[in-house]
From Swiss-Prot:
GO biological process entries: mitochondrial DNA metabolic process; regulation of mitochondrial translational elongation
Protein name according to UniProt: Putative ATP-dependent helicase IRC3
GO molecular function annotations of the record: ATP binding; double-stranded DNA helicase activity; forked DNA-dependent helicase activity; hydrolase activity; Y-form DNA binding
Domain Helicase ATP-binding per the UniProt entry, residue ranges: 46-211
Organism, scientific name: Saccharomyces cerevisiae (strain ATCC 204508 / S288c) (Baker's yeast)
The keyword Mitochondrion belongs to this UniProt entry's keyword annotation: yes
Protein's cellular compartments: Mitochondrion
EC class: hydrolase
Membership in a protein family: Belongs to the helicase family. IRC3 subfamily.
Amino acid sequence: MTSTLATRLSTYSISLILQRIKIIKRCYSAPVLRDYQQDAIDACVNSIRQGTKRIGVSLATGGGKTVIFSNLINQLRQNYFKERQGNFKSLILVHRRELALQATATLKKIFPDLKVHIEMGKYDCDIEDSDVIVASVQTLIRRLHKYDTNSVNLIIIDEAHHSVANSYRSILDHFKASTAETKIPVIGFSATFERADKRALSMVMDKIVYHRGILEMIDDKWLCEAKFTSVKIEADLSDVKSTADDFQLAPLSSLMNTKEINEVILKTYLHKKQEKSLKSTLLFGVDKAHVQSLHKLFKDNGINTDYVTSDTKQIERDNIIQKFKNGETEVLMNCGIFTEGTDMPNIDCILLCRPTKSRSLLIQMIGRGLRLHHSKDHCHIIDFIGASSVGVVSAPTLLGIRSDDIEFDDATVEDLKAIQGEIIAKQQKIDERLRALFQTDEAAMENVTERNSVADWIHSANSVDLTLCSFDSFRNFTQSNNSYPSGKEFDEASEAVKEMELLMNSQYPWVKFASNAWGLPLKGKNHLRIYKEKSEDKLSMVYHLKMYRQLPCFITNKYADYVPKSIIKDANLWNVMSKVEKIINTLNSDLEGQTMQYQAISSKYSKWRQTVPTSKQRDFVFRKLKKVYGESSKDFIRLSLDDVTTYVNTKMTKGDASNLIFASSLAPVYPLKSLLRILEYQKRRSFIK
């Protein structure tokens, strides 16, 4: 054996052998990292050196997280060998087969000397012989008995927003890596550290050490440009039940999977295909039935289409994906399959036919189409938006545009930023006007007198909006032929005017639920309240802004219960309202799906708020008003129950109903009685005229 080897070696010169080794090394050398990829690695290494070892990297889909953590493993491995002897073993946790195969292929390509093993299904890992173990969480949780608690030196979690799940936490517990005192670095990678069930990622991660989102990646040309188009469909999402922070799929599918809506989706695709020469479109549907209906419709219209659901076998799924990558399939449809883990960079169009309240899900769907590819310059994102889409996130809302009234066609990120700038400029003009009104009492008074008569204005104004005001103060204020009161009366009237101007001119739907208290709903069953209360020295009044978070019923063992948090106290309501604006802007500016405990709401000027209420809303509001009216009918001289019925059936908008339902959840009588008093006063004015 030795002589044979010597004979073979004798036929080659030493220099030729070395040359071939260099060629092999060069073929398999790690690719040059992008600047931000190296920055992410450096941030992780520095954090570990400083003692914070449970860390996260937030990177937009298409940013190359597999390349990053492969190089990170290599760098930490090299640092380890510089400091000590022994083996360095890395564990990569994934929750999908595609992610496991992708990580394995990348590691073997970049670092061929590493022994990479898979722990998944039929693949049984040889722990002792491995440098890197890529493990399916579902499989590893059943095979933990194979692993010594000290057998790994590094844990990488792919798609780490799943890491709060019990299975992940059990694995981390096994390796003594579930607390901030862990000796093993735990590094999570995700496009969005936000969970639909709101379980705190702080249980697994102590710090997000690096973040780079979609907008930055597009600006720096690491992701392709997106062009956004919104298409209005006849779908009222307000009655669709929700679970956690997204819609229940069955009722959502019943609403979306109709002949009319599916025809709109088809016609939109055909128009865009002809106009933009689309070649590879990915469609997200609600559920299997929805996807199958759309597949049949598209196929009947001559479109080469295929679909994947959870029922699709793995071999068939792989074949379908490969055909799509090869350009043989024009439209690939799915429901919840391709939000993570599958790279299809040839996608040049995304059809969002699955409305969602989840920012993270929307970011994942959009991100599927933004990878760079030689066949495209940009990706068309077509969002099908219901006429009443309260609480639904869309591409524009991710970019900071809250208006439901603006429609887009091929709008780039720069276009949307320009629109956002226009909206901000308009709001600034409103703010400047309100600030001027607040400078002096006289300015506020003059603004009211320009209406000719406050009483006439009350007669013509929206009834629910008027419940924001201290109605008795305004009625007193308009007496004596609208002559100005003086002294204390003047101060009280002026203060009421200020409250009216700020609350009624706010772009958000405030409600008044007590004589000196107002509320503003936030998504997620949380809300803001402003209380007008005595200052600490009892000598003056201040406005106290609080944020309320609703506790789950399983914690309270009863119906809604809230945890309040004091935000600001100020004698000037303007300062409090400015703080509200900052809070909501802060929530809306978190564009890349970071965890948000509170979420902002749509504008009170949104188109859906002017539409007719649902039958459920009408019935609910009428029952509440009827009950309050019956208990205090003696307080109303001219108002009859028929008048209440007329208001609910002909005058109340969906926005009004939403306000009343929210207000009555905070106080069951006051807001409803205030509305009845407004209706009484408006009827009295009509009778006099």
